[in-house]
């Protein structure tokens, strides 16, 4: 983002809540954490099932045998990564697959967590964690959220109305 030429100031005000509002927010954050952890658990199971399959193991073995720095291996690695991605996509291991899967987990909490929050807020967070682990060097494994780890939720609405 481009730096602004005008002088700017940021004002941070504390959010003063009544006890019942605080309790309602805490309940929704806890429910979001439970949905997140349930989704992580289910997707880890799905990933473990594909990891023990023969085609996936063969692809991984070939990927590990090649060197990314070697110019001759780069094209082969690219095709192997594409094959692995196709294999993962067949079981619904994509952002849209996660958004489709979350409908099974938030229904029980439908009074507190709406579909827009679950589909556009929680599922992309779970996908981002798996994406780091699978496709980037940043992540080694996906962690569950501890109690009081979630401090905000977001949803999405086409009409612009929230809640």
Task: Give each language-model segment a name.
Residues 1-163:
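Nucleic-acid substrate recognition interfaces
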